[in-house]
From Swiss-Prot, chains A, B:
This is Histidine--tRNA ligase. It is found in: Cytoplasm. Pfam families: HGTP_anticodon, tRNA-synt_His. Belongs to the class-II aminoacyl-tRNA synthetase family. It comes from Roseobacter denitrificans (strain ATCC 33942 / OCh 114). SUPFAM superfamilies: Class II aaRS ABD-related, Class II aaRS and biotin synthetases. InterPro entries: aa-tRNA-synth_II (IPR006195), aa-tRNA-synth_II/BPL/LPL (IPR045864), Anticodon-bd (IPR004154), Anticodon-bd_dom_sf (IPR036621), His-tRNA-ligase (IPR015807), HisRS-like_core (IPR041715), HisRS/HisZ (IPR004516), HisRS_anticodon (IPR033656). It catalyses: tRNA(His) + L-histidine + ATP = L-histidyl-tRNA(His) + AMP + diphosphate + H(+). The keyword RNA-binding does not apply. The lineage of its organism: Bacteria, Pseudomonadati, Pseudomonadota, Alphaproteobacteria, Rhodobacterales.
């Protein structure tokens, strides 16, 4: 008989683009989500948790982001039933597509308007990169079925409260708002400027290839171009709005082929931000006031800032800013973005603004795919991992978890005594554990306490047991003394205390309090 | 040109076996997980969050549960790279398999022993049934690398603390412990009883088909049989340990073919529970004392109960119970199970014990698949959804979320005033919202407040605005009055109050406090 082949051992590795989170990384995120949920709830939003798996049919197979139509999902086919092939299922790629499905499925049971929040992992089947993972958290709040801009204003206020709830101080952030309708006004105005649009041969072909009307294709280029303001700068944007642009490699990107007058209008929109919100509104009215939709957009921005001011969310926090272009292609009305204004050092030691941590806006096609009915919606997504990184960069998050008090095992036969000690400490609310490894080598036990970042070790050998005392070692102080052994003032401070067994909890609590570690 | 076919609208439905969770269902589970995490943390366990996706290779393709080898996972193949086929990925089916992968992958960076907790969704590709979903939560704590039964004892204590932390009172639960080693002792003892095991023809064939030694096959039947004690009762188990058993349909199940003396030993083990833990230990020693492994198992049980007593986890909460058989086939040492002892009414109105809500035990092959090295581990899994159901059955959970205070919109042009009111309420920590639907029909606004389960509605029309007052409607009291309109005492109690605008927050807070709804 042939010897059966030995199966090779499996590799102990996460799939590419996935990672594990340990200790404080997990609990800090959990706490942040809980605080944000608290704010969302206070604003009247109800929790919704849908599952990670949806039918591909309900989800739509690809992300809506026009620039990356190939960004995919993780999908698989269910086993076939007796008479029909299995459904295709997929992991959700965001929390908005499931919201659309939920709203269409349960709409008779949901309040109208429906304010809901959702937080949880989403999955993207894309090439992983540095700091770019294929599973990450989203933390969204959306109002479905409210066409009033009061809904948008409310979400901007909520965004401010969320940032403050997680530890971003007032003055360290700003919520910038813009409106797709103003941009539509800009497009109307430039349309009126060029009765007979100048179209290059290339542009005509492209529009035909896309099966779009020429104006639609042109609008697409304008939208994509202004979305690149950050990356290309003003001159780059001007070139792309005009005949086109050569990049560093010499490759030519064809432009929207607008006239100079048209380009001037677009640029004046992007640069319309004044010293105050009122000034910005005046500038915008000047640019798009002739367009009905444009004027409506400016009116909405004015209304939003007025509603927010009434709730004391003033211009120190809410800024109308036409240069907020991200998402203008996707959204249909107001858009908003929270930006942290403080500077941080990036990985390469360069100082830069931290930038955007949340964004959202109004979109009106939420459930249309399912029901044919247009339902207005507006919502925000907070980038929890970005926010954690920001707090970390500001030194407001201690990423090392405080370890447990470690009760060492001097005498294996008296494990019950040591268990009694940890039980007392835990019942007093103190994080504590008995050493559960092989107790033979005492040095290993202290090394373990060090690995665990323990503040205190408890020692009770035979002598102590007989005398009815325990030794309590202040490991934080001990480490400080070890670091600065030359300093006389440290040398004289004892870091180990002998106390009666009955005073164990009190003494440990005292030491924790000295280090600011009490609960 | 042929008219393009209209794409049919997608169905707005969860995939079969998945469901959505709304409002209080979500927040109550989140709160429960947070409380359990608090206890786990206090016991020195560190959080671990791995992703939902693992390689099939790392995960192992199927569940370890011997009785259901076809219980599957959701799996798919990654897109191929240029030169090699894509990896197979899958959704995790529990939190233990990922722990094994994490421990093998990161072992040099982890403390030893490693106490970790994990909570999150897992997925099973099985036929859904009533109340049986293909995504559900697990909430685990495991200690890896500690061979001492002190680790098992600690987890039993922690289980008690978790139950009390989520609202199960002392006296309403018991943690029952048993030990696989005692069962191994039983098997040794019965092996010694039958020098020449009596084997039916069928039994011999089966053992050969399974490619196992006859004794191994026999042990398998004994294990599976005692695991069916709950379902078959003592007589059923006796039959299956002996020649076999005819079920109601007349089908014969072949048995383990043990002699009467052997069966008596197994049954005496299952019925060894005495009035106290000490009595049980004496009974067990009598049955398996002659077997080395059996004696070791009884010693361990004694040690565990001694360690727990030292931490004041006494016999009112910790019960040695040989009839705990679930998992004895899978685990290698101590096993434990938390059972709620109170009675509830089931769906059909029958009274029954609520039963098990958590279980676990010791298993030693955690990372062996990856490293070849045997690492001892012990851990528990708390059934969060079962626990929520238990609290609900006891009336300790209110599943209706308290709705927000609703500020109604009497005058669409004064939205800023209404926004100012909700801002004040929210800043005072009160859940509140302004009505964001079409305000034309005031009745709809009150209906909305009703749908939202709102405790209070705020009304400010033109008259009130001029007078500088607001109307505050106590909706809870209003509903009570409406229900019992014949009672004179109710009739005279007003449920609507006019207060100065400046007293809005104070009055709302007062009403909430009257209904026990203050924060």
């Amino acid at each position: 008989m042939a010897k059966p082949k030995k199966t090779p051992r499996p590799k102990a590795q996460t799939p590419k683009g996935f990672r594990d989170y340990f200790g404080a990384e997990v609990s800090q995120r959990a706490e942040m989500l809980q605080r944000i949920a608290g704010v969302y709830h206070r604003y009247g939003f109800d929790a919704l948790e849908s599952s990670g798996v949806e039918t591909v049919e309900a989800l739509g197979k690809f992300l809506p982001d026009v620039d990356r139509p190939n960004e995919g999902v993780f999908a698989w086919q269910e086993d076939a039933d007796a008479d029909k092939p299995g459904d295709w299922l997929a992991l959700r790629y965001d929390l908005t597509a499931p919201l659309a499905r939920v709203y269409a499925q349960h709409q008779n049971d949901l309040p109208k308007p429906y304010r809901r929040y959702a937080m949880g992992p989403v999955w993207r089947n894309e090439k992983p990169g540095p700091g770019r993972f294929r599973q990450f958290y989203q933390c969204d709040a959306d109002t479905v079925g409210a066409s009033s801009v009061a809904a948008d204003a409310e979400i901007c206020a909520m965004l401010c409260d969320c940032l403050e709830a997680v530890g971003i101080e007032r003055g360290d952030y700003v919520v910038r708002i813009n409106n797709r309708k103003v941009l539509n006004g800009v497009l109307e105005v430039i349309g009126a400027l060029g009765d007979e649009p100048r179209l290059s041969q290339h542009f005509q072909e492209m529009a035909e290839n896309l099966g779009k009307k020429m104006t639609a294709a042109k609008v697409g280029i304008v939208l994509r171009t202004i979305d690149k303001l950050d990356r290309l700068g003003k001159e780059g944007v001007r070139s792309l709005l005009g005949p086109g642009r050569k990049d560093e490699s010499g490759d030519l990107t064809f432009g929207a082929d607008l006239s100079k007058a048209q380009i001037d209008v677009v640029m004046s929109f992007l640069e319309a931000k004044g010293g105050t919100n009122s000034e910005t509104l005046i500038n915008l009215r000047e640019i798009v006031g002739r367009s009905r939709i444009g004027k409506e957009g400016v009116d909405e921005l004015e209304k939003i800032s007025e509603l927010l001011s009434a709730g004391s969310y003033g211009p120190d926090r809410i800024v109308i800013d036409p240069s907020v272009v991200r998402g203008l292609g996707y959204y249909t009305g107001p858009v908003y973005e929270a930006e942290l204004t403080f500077e941080i050092q990036d990985d390469k030691g360069r100082t830069r603004n931290f930038g955007s941590v949340a964004g959202g806006g109004r979109y009106d096609d939420l459930v249309k795919r399912f029901t044919g009915q247009e339902v207005p919606a507006t919502g925000v997504s907070i980038g929890v991992d970005r926010l954690l990184a920001a707090l970390h960069a500001k030194g407001r998050l201690d990423t090392t978890d405080v370890g447990p008090v470690v009760v060492t095992v001097m005498d294996r036969d008296r494990m019950a005594d040591y268990q009694a000690m940890v039980a007392e400490l835990r019942q007093a609310g103190i994080r504590a554990e008995v050493y559960l490894g092989n107790p033979k080598n005492f040095g290993n036990q202290l090394k373990y306490a060090d690995t665990r970042n323990s503040p205190v070790a408890v020692i009770e050998g035979g002598d102590e047991h007989e005398k009815g005392v325990v030794q309590i070692k202040d490991l934080i102080l001990g480490a400080e003394i070890a670091k600065s052994a030359t300093l006389e003032e440290w040398k004289d401070r004892p870091s180990q205390f002998e106390v009666p067994r009955a005073e164990l909890v009190a003494k440990v609590r005292e030491i924790l309090a000295q280090h600011g570690l009490e609960k």
